[in-house]
Amino acid sequence: MMRWNFSPEDLSSIFRNNSTLPKITVKNVDIEFTIPTAVTIEVEPSPVQQDNPPISSEQADFSLAQPDSPSLPLESPEESESSAQQEATAQTPNPPKEVEPSPVQQEFPAEPTEPAKEVEPSATQQEASGHPLKSTKEVNPPPKQEIPAQPSEPPEKVELSPVLQQAPTQLLEPLKKVECSPVQQAVPAQSSEPSIVVEPSPVQQIAHLCLQSSLRKWNPL
């Protein structure tokens, strides 16, 4: 690298001797800078701020007064106990309000000896009484049902069992007229279904009498 060192005198001599250089005139340009004393900053509100309407002073006072008031009104101990009882009753599916004995329990006592005489025959029983059957039916009353301490549903409507609906008017007659063997008397004691005693037909009775007469002829004793 070559370095040229020129003094100011050398430079002046060069510029003076060289006439080919153009003349350069420098003009002072007046530049004015206007600097404002107070800077005004314009801030545009964001869209989130535009969506929220301005809150008036009354609304602000009301919102400030709200935290002072309790969220839930205070209740007296009696009302709180009653509300707790209402919630407890609402949680139970069906509270045992009034348990009425069913008509089946009212008609049949704990140890029935004779059928209930106050039972009114239904329409099917009246029709059956018009056409009496040959076979006599012995209907044992169902055992007394025990009432639970807290029934799931109160017995509002109790329908009669199909045994009582289908039984003819022979229920009104005493059980003395019904003849049954000791085996038949012992078996249906625990069963709810009626025991049927079938009487022999006239043909069977005649055949039985003929056999007895023939046996008597052979055995006069």
Swiss-Prot record:
Q: What's the domain of life for this entry?
A: Eukaryota
Residue ranges, annotated region (Disordered): 40-162
Q: Which InterPro entries match?
A: LRRC37 (IPR015753), LRRC37_N (IPR032754)
- Record's Pfam families? LRRC37
Q: Where is the composition biased (Low complexity)?
A: 82-92
Q: Composition bias, kind Polar residues: at what positions?
A: 47-60
What is the protein name stated in its UniProt record?
A: Putative uncharacterized protein FLJ43944
Which species?
Homo sapiens (Human)
Top-level taxonomy:
Eukaryota, Metazoa, Chordata, Craniata, Vertebrata
